[in-house]
């Protein structure tokens, strides 16, 4: 049975269909998939209209920074701190996993920051793609690596 507070909507993007879910507390997840496996909620694009518009503007190049409430209620506190730190990385720039860990208040937790980025349910609003290895290589990522490359290239113009 769907969570009565959870709403979903979808958007076609250059990297595929994205399914958004959210609550009154904010945007909860973004999943890139043809169908939203495991995301059950009331289909309500109006409830997620700000997120849909901002994502469309991001992919068209008109938006460089998101201004959305996020529902991080089910996220571990360290992961939430890492996500907030990643959101400070400007459009078109990158930071290492170690730098993001330090920004999140845990300078010795680069690997843990990497695991948090790999599990981030809110890309590209939380710009996990901007977090790379200290040697400048883009490293791995939860979604396919081509998506990370595409997002980095998109922001570099």
Where are the regions that the model predicts?
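Basic nucleic-acid-binding alpha-helical/helix-turn surface characteristic of O6-alkylguanine DNA
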Residues: 1-108, 154-157
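Short amphipathic alpha-helical/adjacent loop interface patches that line ligand
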Residues: 52, 117, 121, 145
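Regulatory, non-catalytic segments
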Residues: 108-123
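Extracytoplasmic/periplasmic beta-strand context in beta-sandwich domains
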Residues: 115, 130, 149-150
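Short Lys/Arg-enriched helix C-cap and helix-to-coil transition segments
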Residues: 124-131
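…primarily DNA-binding HTH/wHTH and HhH modules…
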Residues: 134-157
């Amino acid at each position: 049975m769907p969570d009565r507070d959870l709403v979903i909507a979808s958007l076609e993007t250059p990297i595929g269909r994205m399914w958004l879910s959210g609550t009154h507390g904010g945007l909860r997840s973004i999943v890139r998939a043809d169908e939203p496996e495991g995301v059950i909620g009331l289909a309500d694009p109006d409830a997620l209209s700000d997120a849909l518009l901002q994502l469309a503007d991001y992919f068209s190049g008109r938006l460089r920074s998101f201004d959305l409430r996020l529902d991080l209620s089910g996220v571990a506190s360290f992961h939430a701190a890492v996500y907030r730190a990643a959101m400070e990385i400007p459009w078109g720039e990158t930071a290492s996993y170690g730098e993001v860990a330090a920004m999140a208040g845990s300078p010795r937790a680069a690997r843990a920051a990497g695991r948090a980025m790999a599990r981030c349910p809110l890309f590209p609003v939380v710009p996990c793609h901007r977090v790379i290895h200290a040697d400048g290589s883009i490293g791995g990522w939860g979604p396919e690596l081509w998506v990370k490359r595409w997002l980095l290239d998109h922001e570099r113009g």
